[in-house]
Amino acid sequence: MLMLGMNFSATLQLLLPISLTINLLQLSKCHHYVDRAILRGITIFALPAIGLALWASTHWSLSLEVFVAILVLTFSLQDRLGFVRATLDRLLEFQRTYITIMGLVHGASNLGGSMLTALAFGKGLDRHVSRATIVAGYILFATIQLATLYLAGEEWQIDFGVEASLIVSGAITFWLTERYIFTKFDSKKYRKGLEILLIATGILLLLSSF
């Protein structure tokens, strides 16, 4: 969206209601699987960081694509390279620091979701727990972002008709994915899918930084 000439605030105003709707629909089916320890860490450490960084981003912008790309690509290699696994195990011993940095990155660039996915992948969570925790985290992210934009006095720039049609499209996409795709994934396939997602995300972020 930034490439299409929309500023950061307008991009968030377009994407966040859609993301929030889809994730609420997902959470309604899997809320009992949420890893509450991770969610508590997000609430305490990430949300204030998101609010602070997003408020700051309304005054200046910061490019974090390369940082996030390197991080998620590193996480994607943990099942392939033993020394990467050992390094990430040590990194995740400082989970509060990681979550705080994730919040700062998300507030400044909206790229913290990739770091949350990497965290779930790195901890080797069961596919249901991983999915539910990521979804719950996204909901908290979107809620604090929308609240921060409102409190910062950002004028709403997106046509409500366009927003509503995109929300409906997102809900239909979720229903189709839930019905025909997710049910076909066991834990092994889900983890492989996350690995591919992290690799693709990292490559796309690197490409977008040039």
Where are these regions (language model features)?
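Transmembrane helix exit motif
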Residues: 25-33, 54, 62, 66-91, ...
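Small-residue-rich hydrophobic segments that form or flank transmembrane alpha-helices
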Residues: 1-40, 99, 103-107, 111-170
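Hydrophobic alpha-helical transmembrane segments in multi-pass integral membrane proteins
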Residues: 52-57, 61, 65, 105-112, ...
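A helix-boundary/kink motif common to multi-pass secondary transporters
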Residues: 7-8, 60-61, 126, 186-190
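Interfacial loop-to-transmembrane junctions
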Residues: 37, 41, 177-200
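Residues within membrane-spanning alpha-helices of integral membrane proteins
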Residues: 16, 69-72, 76, 135, ...
